[in-house]
Each structure stands twice: as structure tokens, then as C-alpha cells.
């Protein structure tokens, strides 16, 4: 095939005319491009000016400078300031032979991990403090298997005024076997004699003081037994409606039975079946009984607003182990702070009309400083700084610090956890803290702090080398009367 070539038949004159036309076209195109560029620049400038003239004005953010002050540094007092107070074990000399029975035979049932309550009170009104030890007993299914297991009862000891106690349980009306948990003392019938309320796994018990060293069971008449399948822990008498008689708040723990316990089946590696946290047990509601003034109570738990449900599951939330009745804002009406195990703590503010509002979260008491729940158990309150600030102390599980919530100066219903700055946090972290108690042990006018400690598992060291089954109590001395001007120091 021949290659195509340009047509050479055109004359030279025609070629010159074509080149002239091309040159004129290039000039026109160049001029058009130049004016297009000018127009584009003009439009950009005009658009920029228009945008800045008509754009929405930004809201002015007012910046306020503020000075953030660090917490006041706590000065740990020198050793010479901490009193060298000694305590002596006098149980045997005092004549106390009570032995607690948790009913354990090897099944590792959760109630067995709880110690029962104890109360100092003057039951015979002779001017000295007597002692009541609440007791557990053997489980009924174990008694059927082993008839040699004899039921055990609580122990009542009368103080002779000379530091010696006499066991007067037999014949007192308290020599009854049931799986007891906690105890509350109060004169519910206003006859001048202290009465007894015992919480339990199963039905709770009310005992009216007859004044002759004997008590009678008035649970049925008083209508305060609670549910047969409930597990109640702590309780407190308090006059919630300011009518002159004592009402009754009762903490309930978890929904429990032997069958449920085995379904949960908590185990530890290297140990096997073990006592564990209540995480996988369903929660419950606390109970509130209003004293009607005639020896009877009315259950107002539902109408009082204390039945708190999980926002996520709508199931009962409470897993309560401790309660402290206290007038938080000093308005003349008693409120309740409730220590919950692995769910947030409750603060029930008295609304002065027979109902309460729950404000654990917004008060600052519900959680730790990181917004997490803890294994809260024992609870007590005190104005340990000797001023208007209220302290709420709560004993928590192992590897969790004591909580020491302190009310703020400008809002008595707002608390911050000052456990670290007050000196009780780091030293208490390792221990598993069941009971907690404010008292002035050295009589210097400042409330000190005691915790009662111990682990659930006898073989816990196999799993956690830092833990032990037996743990000593821990005593913190209030340094308020020293140059430190506050805080606590561990007493060795």
C-alpha cells in the first residue's frame, strides 16, 4: 500500500492565504483567553468580598480566666503525734464463749461468706451495755443428711457492770435457730425498752422487750417479716415522717437459693467451686416499713420510691449490705445512704411526704472517682473534721480503697471521695473490708476510723499471692488535733 502524502496540487498563493487566516485565528483566541482570565479573577475577588460582607457572624465565645487550685497537701504527722494506744484481747476473761456458725459443710454457698451482726445495747436498762451476737445455723438439707448437726442460736450476754458478761440466751426468747444476718436496735413501741430486729436468709424477726430479761417474737403482729425467700442483710430504725415513732429500713442482698447458687457456679482456678461476687445473681429491692404507732407496721416500699431498677434491664438493682440513716442536708428529715455490692450506692433523699428521691449518682456517692462501682459493704457516717462537712465511710472489696465521701462546703448534698487526700485510701486498698466504724478511740475529741477485714476464700493465696484469708483489722487515727490539721494516719 502506498503511503499517504499531503496534497501537493494546491498553489503557493493558496498556502499563503491559509497561513494568514491561521495567524488571525490565533490572535482572536489569545485575546479571548486573556479576557476570560481577567473575568475569572474579577469573579473570585468579588465573591470573596461578598462572602465576607454577608457571611453569618460567628458567636463570640466569652473566655473567662480562672485560677485552678490544687488540693491542699496533707501533711502526714510525725510518729510522735500518733498515740501509742494498746488494745488487749479480753474475750475469755469477759466470759464470752459465743462461736459463730455459718453453716458451711463444703458446698460454698454465698451466705456462708457473710459474718453475722453484733450489737451493744442495754437490754435490761441497768446503765451498762450488754451484748447480742446474731448467729447462723446449719442448712436444713444438711441437717437431714447429718442428724448430728445441732441447730445453733444467737447469743445474749448480760453485763454485770464489772467487765464480765453472763450468757443469758436460754429462756430469753432469743434461743431460736434461724440463719441470722444483721441486727437493729430500737424502741419501736415507745415503752422505754430497746427492742430487736434481726435480718436473715428467709423471714426476718422482730423481738419486743418485755422488761424482765425476756423477749417475745412479734414479727407476725408487727408485719415486718419480709419475704420467705428473701435474703436481708442490714437494717436500721429511723423516724422517717417525724411522727415520734421509729420506722424500719431493711437492706436486701440478692435473689438467692441453693439451686441458683449452683447455677451460678463460681469457681477459682486451682481451687474449684468458691465463694464469689454477686455479679451473676439478680438484684433485689430494699424494704421500708412505716410504724403505725399501734405495734404494727405498713410496708410502703413501693410507694416510697426506694425500689430502684436497672435502666438497662429494668430488673431490681439493689445488692445492699449496709445502710446509714442520716440527715444529709440538716433539714430535719432523715435520709438514707445505702452501700451496694457491685452496683452503684443509693442515696435516698427524704421528700417530707413519705417518699424519697434516689440521688446516688448526682450526689457523688454512687460511684468511685472514675465512675465505677465497687464491692461496697460496711458503712458509717461522721463529721470527722469537727465542722459542717459530713463524711460517709464505706468499706469495699479487696484491691479497692476505702471510700470516704465528704460533703462540699456550698452543697451538703454533693460529695467527693477524699479517701486519698485524707490518708485512708492507699493503705486500705489491699484488704477486704467488711465492717467500718467511726469512733474516738483515744478520746481526743476527733473521730477515728476502724475497719474489720478478711477474705472470703481460705485458699485465696493460691490464686492471689497478695491476699490472705485472715486479715487484721485496720485503725486510722484522726490527725485533726495536730499540726497536720486533718487527715488520718495508720496506727501500727
Predicted ranges, named:
Residues 1-492:
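Acidic, glycine/proline-rich Ca2+-coordinating loop motifs
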Amino acid at each position: 500500500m502506498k503511503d499517504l502524502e499531503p496534497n501537493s496540487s494546491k498553489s503557493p498563493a493558496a498556502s499563503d492565504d491559509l497561513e494568514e487566516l491561521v495567524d488571525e485565528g490565533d490572535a482572536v483566541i489569545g485575546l479571548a483567553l486573556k479576557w476570560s482570565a481577567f473575568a475569572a479573577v474579577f469573579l473570585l475577588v468579588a465573591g470573596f468580598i461578598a462572602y465576607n460582607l454577608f457571611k453569618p457572624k460567628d458567636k463570640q465565645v466569652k473566655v473567662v480566666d480562672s485560677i485552678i487550685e490544687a488540693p491542699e497537701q496533707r501533711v502526714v504527722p510525725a510518729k510522735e503525734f500518733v498515740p501509742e494506744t494498746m488494745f488487749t484481747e479480753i474475750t475469755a476473761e469477759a466470759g464470752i464463749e459465743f462461736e459463730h456458725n455459718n453453716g458451711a459443710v463444703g458446698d460454698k454457698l454465698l451466705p456462708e461468706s457473710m459474718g453475722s451482726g453484733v450489737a451493744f445495747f442495754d437490754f435490761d436498762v441497768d446503765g451498762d451495755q450488754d451484748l447480742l451476737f446474731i448467729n447462723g445455723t446449719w442448712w436444713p438439707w444438711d441437717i437431714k443428711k447429718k442428724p448430728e448437726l445441732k441447730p445453733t442460736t444467737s447469743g445474749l450476754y448480760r453485763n454485770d457492770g464489772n467487765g464480765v458478761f453472763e450468757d443469758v440466751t436460754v429462756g430469753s426468747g432469743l434461743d431460736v435457730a434461724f440463719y441470722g444476718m444483721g441486727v437493729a436496735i430500737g424502741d419501736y413501741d415507745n415503752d422505754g425498752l430497746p427492742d430487736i430486729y434481726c435480718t436473715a436468709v428467709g423471714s426476718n424477726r422482730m423481738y419486743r422487750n418485755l422488761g424482765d430479761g425476756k423477749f417475745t417474737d412479734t414479727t407476725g403482729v408487727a408485719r415486718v417479716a419480709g419475704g420467705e425467700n428473701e435474703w436481708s442483710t442490714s437494717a436500721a430504725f429511723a423516724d422517717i415522717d417525724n411522727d415520734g415513732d421509729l420506722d424500719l429500713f431493711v437492706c436486701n442482698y440478692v435473689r438467692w437459693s441453693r439451686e441458683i447458687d449452683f447455677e451460678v457456679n463460681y469457681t477459682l482456678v486451682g481451687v474449684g467451686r468458691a465463694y464469689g461476687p454477686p455479679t451473676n445473681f439478680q438484684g433485689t429491692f430494699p424494704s421500708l416499713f412505716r410504724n403505725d404507732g399501734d405495734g404494727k407496721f405498713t410496708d410502703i416500699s413501693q410507694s416510697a420510691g426506694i425500689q430502684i431498677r436497672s435502666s438497662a434491664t429494668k430488673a431490681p438493682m439493689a445488692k445492699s449490705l449496709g445502710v446509714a440513716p442520716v440527715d444529709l442536708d440538716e433539714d430535719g428529715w432523715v435520709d438514707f445512704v445505702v452501700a451496694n455490692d457491685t452496683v452503684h450506692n443509693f442515696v435516698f433523699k427524704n421528700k417530707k411526704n413519705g417518699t424519697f428521691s434516689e440521688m446516688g449518682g448526682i450526689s457523688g456517692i454512687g460511684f468511685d472517682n472514675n465512675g465505677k462501682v465497687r464491692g461496697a459493704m460496711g458503712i458509717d457516717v461522721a463529721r470527722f473534721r469537727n465542722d459542717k462537712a459530713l463524711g460517709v465511710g464505706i468499706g469495699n472489696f479487696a484491691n479497692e480503697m476505702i471510700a470516704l465521701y465528704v460533703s462540699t462546703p456550698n452543697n451538703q448534698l454533693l460529695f467527693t471521695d477524699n479517701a486519698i487526700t485524707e490518708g485512708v485510701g492507699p493503705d486500705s486498698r489491699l484488704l477486704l473490708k467488711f465492717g467500718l466504724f467511726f469512733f474516738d478511740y483515744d478520746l481526743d475529741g476527733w473521730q477515728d476510723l476502724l475497719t474489720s477485714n478478711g477474705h472470703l476464700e481460705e485458699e485465696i493465696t493460691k490464686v492471689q499471692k497478695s491476699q490472705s484469708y485472715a486479715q487484721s483489722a485496720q485503725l486510722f487515727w484522726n490527725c485533726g488535733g495536730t499540726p497536720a490539721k486533718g487527715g488520718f494516719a495508720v496506727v501500727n
